[in-house]
C-alpha cells in the first residue's frame, strides 16, 4: 500500500530550499523533499525533472516571480520545473515550479496555458523545448559545480546556495550543459508508447515541443 497522499496538497513554496537563479538545484532538492514527506513516491518514480530551453537560450515564460512586468513574463536562458505524474491514477499531472506565481502545485494543463502560453505567436528563435528526465535518473547522473554562474574573474553572477555542489554518483562534477542543450532537431518524431518508454529510460531523457508536452505524460509507462 502506497504512502502517497491521494489528493494534491496546496503548499507554501517558501517551505522549500530556493536560491534565485539556481533552478536546477532547487528542483533537485524539491524532488527529494516531495519523496521524503510522502507527497511523491518514496522512490521518486512519479516525478520528472523538466528543463525548458532552446538553441538561442532565450525562452519566454509567464507568471514568473522574477518578472517586473504585470504579465509576469521573463526571458530565461533556461528554466527547470518538476512534473508529478501519479501512476495508476486518473488525476492530472502536477507542475511544481518554485519560481511561478501560479498555485503550487498547478495542474499541467493550466500551467501550460498560463506559463507557456502556446497561443501566443512567437518568432522561431523563442520556441520552447522541454527535456523530460525521470527523477531517479536525474539524482544518479546530474552534477553542477556552478561554473556557469561565474564571471571570468571568478566572481559570482548570483550568490550560490549555502550547501555543497551536487556531484553525480559516478563522480562527475558538472554536466548541466548536457541537460539544457536542445533544439527542434532533438524532439521525438513519434510519441508511440515504445519510443517514449525507451527514451525516458535514458540518462538525458527525452526532448519534446510544447505541442507534445501534455501528450507525452499520457504515454509514460
From Swiss-Prot:
<keyword id="KW-0611">Plant defense</keyword>
<dbReference type="GO" id="GO:1901183">
    <property type="term" value="P:positive regulation of camalexin biosynthetic process"/>
</dbReference>
<dbReference type="InterPro" id="IPR023128">
    <property type="entry name" value="Prot_N_Gln_amidohydro_ab_roll"/>
</dbReference>
<comment type="similarity">
    <text>Belongs to the NTAQ1 family.</text>
</comment>
<dbReference type="GO" id="GO:0008418">
    <property type="term" value="F:protein-N-terminal asparagine amidohydrolase activity"/>
</dbReference>
<dbReference type="GO" id="GO:0042742">
    <property type="term" value="P:defense response to bacterium"/>
</dbReference>
<dbReference type="Pfam" id="PF09764">
    <property type="entry name" value="Nt_Gln_amidase"/>
</dbReference>
<feature type="modified residue" description="N-acetylserine">
    <location>
        <position position="2"/>
    </location>
</feature>
<feature type="active site">
    <location>
        <position position="79"/>
    </location>
</feature>
<dbReference type="InterPro" id="IPR037132">
    <property type="entry name" value="N_Gln_amidohydro_ab_roll_sf"/>
</dbReference>
<dbReference type="GO" id="GO:0070773">
    <property type="term" value="F:protein-N-terminal glutamine amidohydrolase activity"/>
</dbReference>
<comment type="subunit">
    <text>Monomer.</text>
</comment>
<protein>
    <recommendedName>
        <fullName>Protein N-terminal glutamine amidohydrolase</fullName>
        <ecNumber>3.5.1.122</ecNumber>
    </recommendedName>
</protein>
<comment type="function">
    <text>Mediates the side-chain deamidation of N-terminal glutamine residues to glutamate, an important step in N-end rule pathway of protein degradation. Conversion of the resulting N-terminal glutamine to glutamate renders the protein susceptible to arginylation, polyubiquitination and degradation as specified by the N-end rule. Does not act on substrates with internal or C-terminal glutamine and does not act on non-glutamine residues in any position. Involved in immune response.</text>
</comment>
<feature type="active site">
    <location>
        <position position="23"/>
    </location>
</feature>
<keyword id="KW-0007">Acetylation</keyword>
<dbReference type="InterPro" id="IPR039733">
    <property type="entry name" value="NTAQ1"/>
</dbReference>
<keyword id="KW-0378">Hydrolase</keyword>
<feature type="active site">
    <location>
        <position position="97"/>
    </location>
</feature>
